[in-house]
């Protein structure tokens, strides 16, 4: 289970913080100090008030002056209610972030037309990543703080309050110090995480510090204590200016304006990735939404000057090899697992390694906290089940098909010339088996002729009720003439149906199309092999492709143009680019022995499966000269079979006869007789002997056209298909989004297991822990309530976006009232309550999200890179919008919008100083001795984390002292 595991230093710090805050808040009451310090706070209030004001929604809890016991009870109720509201905000923010992920994941398809006329299609995201991070993503993660500031101003007659602005500053401090400290510490020892888009980080960090500096300027320098309309509006308009600057830095549009960019296919899912290069050819054209755009058009695709997709990009190959390696390792590690479990494991590993947005980590953290389970594991399991189910699709004709299909069992048949007849099987499948079905058949000449090679045959086959198979026979004519292999055709036609209800067996032809029809194949090809020759031996084709996962490869050796006699055919494997000896295949050699009338033999070769993603290696299988096993002495003489001989003591045609010696381990168990060259006196043969020699030569077994088969070993088709599916980048909008209300309600009432320390066993189904059940029952009310929010499928996520932000605003109003009443009950000022409790509550989901991102992501951008941008957006939106509305309202009434600069200005200044220290330390950590902003050696991690926690504690400490006038403010 994912938990916010803090070191003893963190735990001690939080305990000291709680004690310190309460101590400071009661110092004035204990010493009965009531003096006013003008410099500390213009309102003259240096102590917390026990007098509560009516909230935006919640009324005052009467009486106003309860007993000490009632105060404790009220404070407990307010605190528990506030925590419960924070849980609700986290859950509705989960829906909100899901809608943002769906919105920012929208893509469009573009077509690239190359100079050679080829076209390539790829997809590009409509939203730029940096723009989405600074707008919708930041709004989603900081919506409670922003809305709290706006609601507080609007709900209190457009007067400035301490809760909203202090929450924004306090949340910024928590994000900048505590979240980054945690991210630095949780990275495993020795590992580092660096910010990938450093220039974007510089821009957002600069704007973040400027935002808080700007607050000090407008509060204490330009118009002390008064916020004018132009100041409020300019604060708000800094938001789009900040976004534009970050976008410019991301797209390199200023300094890099004349550096031409090239886009290549990304590692996953065909997404385009930018890199710099030379000026490309101007002939490349890009078609988007049906419009052709020349490759030199500026500002295309977020400022790109060129789009060029390399279909064989090296990164794609690396991604596939990496995925193949993952699958091989999983198979070796879990040989007992089924394919579904292996695909689930691989899916989860791919999803875990895939780069994710800030929104995803926020959603993942919230669901893990609330017992909703790991969305990556659930999605991986769903995808695995779908993949397996696709393999199990039944392609056979359904038995309940209302139409009967009539067809041959197979499309080709073979027979020997001396077989007499050849049998062909006709199949009836589907339809009403109680009907009688008639089908005509007829032979047709091919290279074989009716009357000389086969008997012309035609007729009608009758399938009686219940019959599903019939056999027809065609006569084959034998002769003693050497012939090539010949073939003829048999056609099916004219299907008719007769039902039991028909009278006198009359055929019902009116409903033939709906009752029965011809299936495939409806024509069979019959090949007649000549049996008057010993045979021509050949492979079926010169080249064959096999999958490396085939195991044992079987290759057919055909015997055509005759099948008389027993023949031996030697064979052997020959290395090519594929190596034998068990590396790519096992060396094989031997002999095939064809019996009389046997026309097919198979050679078996073992292929080694080493599970390479792309494989194209070759070896050869070769057959040698065939030879007859049994041969008469005279035929052996006439064929002049040469070899090693021993003297037999016999004479033939006046010549000594020798026995041939075969150089084989297992000689043929027969005697082959011939005459040695040295005994051949070149005596001419008679005409009769010449004729006998010619006839013997005609019947001799010979090699055919394909004697050397090239075997190309390719990657496993199933393995490659699995890899191709896995390397396609899963759109995370599909993972976090929902398609229906039914799906949302099922998720709301389902308890799922959270994260485990052992991710290697993620394929095993685990039961929810006790913590999962506790968090589920604590949050089930919110889950069911917010299941009514429209699914992200509607309006491309905008329906969910609008409803969610309204719900967040409503809950934020409750949180503001509860926090204010909690503070006044125990005597805390709103500024202190906001900086400590409210800021902490609104930042907990971000803390979990950053922790997950720091441990799982390859870079530090998702964990800390967005912190600075989020801090700037909080000021420009949260304070800019609220103060602009209030300033305009007061200006319209001829009044001034007054804001006390004391506490806020002091907090802002303190935060700015500490933020400079924070950013400086992070940049220093990029030096080679540490290697990155996050992680590194254990000592460096611990020192950095302790420093950042100390900065936060000092910020809280000094802000509280200033709020209670113990130190001089501005």
UniProtKB/Swiss-Prot annotation:
GO molecular function: ankyrin binding; calcium ion binding; calcium:sodium antiporter activity; calmodulin binding
Positions of the Calx-beta domain: 393-493, 524-624
SUPFAM superfamilies registered for this protein in UniProt: CalX-like (SSF141072)
All ranges on the Cytoplasmic side of the membrane: 93-133, 189-201, 250-797, 843-871, 925-941
UniProt cross-references to SMART domains, sorted A to Z: Calx_beta (SM00237)
Amino-acid positions noted as binding Ca(2+) 5 in the UniProt annotation, renumbered to this chain: 548, 610, 612, 715
Coiled coil: none
Pfam families found in the cross-reference section: Calx-beta, Na_Ca_ex, Na_Ca_ex_C
Glycan attachment residues as annotated in the record: 41, 157
Lipid bilayer topology: Multi-pass membrane protein
Activity regulation comment: Activated by micromolar levels of Ca(2+).
Residues annotated as signal peptide: 1-32
Recorded catalytic activity of this chain's protein: Ca(2+)(in) + 3 Na(+)(out) = Ca(2+)(out) + 3 Na(+)(in)
Binding site for Ca(2+) 2: 417, 478-479, 531-532
Start-end of each Alpha- repeat: 138-178, 839-875
PANTHER family attached to this UniProt entry: SODIUM/CALCIUM EXCHANGER (PTHR11878), SODIUM_CALCIUM EXCHANGER 1 (PTHR11878:SF6)
Family affiliation: Belongs to the Ca(2+):cation antiporter (CaCA) (TC 2.A.19) family. SLC8 subfamily.
Name this protein carries in UniProt: Sodium/calcium exchanger 1
Natural source organism: Cavia porcellus
Organismal lineage: Eukaryota, Metazoa, Chordata, Craniata, Vertebrata
């Amino acid at each position: 289970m994912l938990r916010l595991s803090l070191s003893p230093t963190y735990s001690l710090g939080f305990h000291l913080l709680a004690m310190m805050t309460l101590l400071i808040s009661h110092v004035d009451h204990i010493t009965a100090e009531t003096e006013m310090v003008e410099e500390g706070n213009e309102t003259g209030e240096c102590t917390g008030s026990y007098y509560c004001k009516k909230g935006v929604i919640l009324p005052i809890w009467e009486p106003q002056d309860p007993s000490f016991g009632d105060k404790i009870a009220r404070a407990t109720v307010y605190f528990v209610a506030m925590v419960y509201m924070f849980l609700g905000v986290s859950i509705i923010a989960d829906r909100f972030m899901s809608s943002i992920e769906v919105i920012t994941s929208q893509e469009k398809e573009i077509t690239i037309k190359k100079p050679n006329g080829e076209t390539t299609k790829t997809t590009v995201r409509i939203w730029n990543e940096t723009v989405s991070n600074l707008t919708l993503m930041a709004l989603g993660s900081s919506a409670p703080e922003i809305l709290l500031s706006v609601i507080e101003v609007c709900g209190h007659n457009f007067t400035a309050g301490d809760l909203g602005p202090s929450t924004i500053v306090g949340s910024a401090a928590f994000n900048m110090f505590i979240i980054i400290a945690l991210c630095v510490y949780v990275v495993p020892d020795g590992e580092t995480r660096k910010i990938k888009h450093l220039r974007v980080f510089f821009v957002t960090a600069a704007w973040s510090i400027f935002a808080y500096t700007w607050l000090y300027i407008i509060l204490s320098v330009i118009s002390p204590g008064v916020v004018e309309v132009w100041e409020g509006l300019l604060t708000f308009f800094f938001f789009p200016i900040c976004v534009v600057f970050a976008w410019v830095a991301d797209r390199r549009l200023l300094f890099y304006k004349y550096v031409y960019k090239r886009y290549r296919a990304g590692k996953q899912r065909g997404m385009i990735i930018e890199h710099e290069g030379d000026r490309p050819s101007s002939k490349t054209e890009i078609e988007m939404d049906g419009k052709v755009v020349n490759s030199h058009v500026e500002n295309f695709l977020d400022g790109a000057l060129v789009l060029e997709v390399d279909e064989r990009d090296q990164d794609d190959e690396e991604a596939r090899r990496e995925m193949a390696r993952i699958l091989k390792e999983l198979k070796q590690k879990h040989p007992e697992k089924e394919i579904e479990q292996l695909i689930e494991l691989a899916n989860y590993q791919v999803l875990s390694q895939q780069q994710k947005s800030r929104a995803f980590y926020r959603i993942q953290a919230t669901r893990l906290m609330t017992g909703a389970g790991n969305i990556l594991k659930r999605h991986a399991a769903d995808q695995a089940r779908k993949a397996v189910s696709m393999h199990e699709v039944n392609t056979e004709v359904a038995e309940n098909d209302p139409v009967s299909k009539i067809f041959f069992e197979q499309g080709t048949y073979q027979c020997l010339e001396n077989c007499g007849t050849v049998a062909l099987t006709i199949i009836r499948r589907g339809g009403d088996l109680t009907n009688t079905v008639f089908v005509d058949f007829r032979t047709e000449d091919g290279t074989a002729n009716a009357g000389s090679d086969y008997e012309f045959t035609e007729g009608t086959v009758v399938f009686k009720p219940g019959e599903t198979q019939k056999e027809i026979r065609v006569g084959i004519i034998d002769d003693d003439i050497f012939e090539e292999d010949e073939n003829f055709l048999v056609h099916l036609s004219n299907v008719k149906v007769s039902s039991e209800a028909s009278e006198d067996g009359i055929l019902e032809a009116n409903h033939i199309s709906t009752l029965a029809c011809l299936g495939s194949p409806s024509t069979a090809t019959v090949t007649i092999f000549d049996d008057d020759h010993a045979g021509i031996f050949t492979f079926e084709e010169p080249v064959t492709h096999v999958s490396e996962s085939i195991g044992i490869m079987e290759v057919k050796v055909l015997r055509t143009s005759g099948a008389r006699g027993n023949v031996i055919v030697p064979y052997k494997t020959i290395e090519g680019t594929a190596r034998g000896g068990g590396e790519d295949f096992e060396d094989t050699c031997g002999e095939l022995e064809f019996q009389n009338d046997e026309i097919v033999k198979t050679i078996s070769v073992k292929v080694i499966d080493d599970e390479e993603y792309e494989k194209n290696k070759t070896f050869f299988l070769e057959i040698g000269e065939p030879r007859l096993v049994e041969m008469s002495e005279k035929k052996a003489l006439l064929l002049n079979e040469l070899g090693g001989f021993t003297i037999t003591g016999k004479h033939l045609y006046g010549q000594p006869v020798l026995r041939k010696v075969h150089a084989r381990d297992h000689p043929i168990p027969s005697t082959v007789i011939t005459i040695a060259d040295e005994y051949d006196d070149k005596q001419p043969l008679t005409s009769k002997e010449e004729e006998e020699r010619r006839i013997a030569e005609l019947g001799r077994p010979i090699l055919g056209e394909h004697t050397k088969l090239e075997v190309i070993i390719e990657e496993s088709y199933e393995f490659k298909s699995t890899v191709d599916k896995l390397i396609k980048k899963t759109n995370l909008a599909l993972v976090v989004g929902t398609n229906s209300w039914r799906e949302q309600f099922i998720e709301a009432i389902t308890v799922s297991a959270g994260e485990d320390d052992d991710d290697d066993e993620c394929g095993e189904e685990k039961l929810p822990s006790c913590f999962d059940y506790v968090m589920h029952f604590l949050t089930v009310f919110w889950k069911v309530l917010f299941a009514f929010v429209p699914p992200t499928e509607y309006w491309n996520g905008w329906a969910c976006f609008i409803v969610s932000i309204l719900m967040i605003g409503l809950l934020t109003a409750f949180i503001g009232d509860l926090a204010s009443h909690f503070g006044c009950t125990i005597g805390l000022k709103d500024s202190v309550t906001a900086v400590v409790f409210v800021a902490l509550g609104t930042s907990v989901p971000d803390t979990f999200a950053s922790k997950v991102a720091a441990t799982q992501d390859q870079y530090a951008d998702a964990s800390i890179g967005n912190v600075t941008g989020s801090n700037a957006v909080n000021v420009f939106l949260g304070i800019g919008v609220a103060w602009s509305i209030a300033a305009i309202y007061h200006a319209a009434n001829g009044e001034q919008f007054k804001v006390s600069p004391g506490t806020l200005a002091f907090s802002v200044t303190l935060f700015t100083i500490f933020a400079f220290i924070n950013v400086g330390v992070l940049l220093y950590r990029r030096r080679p001795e540490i290697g990155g902003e996050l992680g590194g050696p254990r000592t460096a991690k611990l020192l950095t984390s302790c420093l950042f926690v100390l900065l936060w504690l000092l910020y809280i400490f000094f802000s509280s002292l200033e709020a209670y006038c113990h130190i001089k403010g501005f």
